[in-house]
Amino acid sequence: MTQSERRLFLIKYLFEEREACRASLPPMNEEEQKRVLRSLLNIREPKEPNADFLRVQDAYLQEEIREKGITDANTLEPVEDGIYLWHGDITTLKCGAIVNAANSRLLGCFAPCHLCIDNAIHTFAGVQLRLECNRIMTVQGYPEPTGKAKLTKAYNLPSEYVLHTVGPIIGGKLTEKDEKELASCYTNCLVLAAKKGIKSVAFCCISTGEFHFPNETAAHIAIKTVRNFLKANKDIKVIFNVFLQKDLDIYRRIFGIDG
């Protein structure tokens, strides 16, 4: 199957699953098809699809990621011992584990085509990720607390695993509690990674987007926490993944990188 054929197969399956399929799909260009497919994946509840869907979905997502271009963490240059800075799309990074800035449901973002990292990671990992997260949360029986960490497979992403953590939500003035909770996100992800023998972890800028944590303060907390952890745990590579130019500028300034 071509990518176009896979995309239309998946759209038709997801419409039929929702009992909303028309006799024939309306004409759509490639970008419209991609938006419709992503929207349907985003709103899909965690339930087992059939084997044909998974086979086509996996082939489709892996090709989409390959076309975006995969970056191997082993090719990155450190900014200091054990620490790396990378500007790019975390869903294209090949490493031990990437960190997802999750919400307390831990099921991913249900808003169609939302631009948050939670949406992107669940979209390109595939429906299996939401299924695994749902199993974890069903067993747990209560919302995920702020500052903790959970580990899942990464499925169709280039990384081996995804670490999920819920950062603090800032609704007013930043507090010491907020800062401690953010530090806990980094520490608990690294502790869990070390426990599982994961050798490289890529952190997004936790809480700085939809959760409104001040970017510069968050970066200082992230770097300080990671440096402290690496003093006693030198076997893990830590990658600070930044997507926005302003975050890249902040991290470069803190690390003293020119240009």
Regions found by a protein language model. Name each.
Residues 1-259:
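Macrodomain-like recognition of ADP-ribose-binding/processing modules
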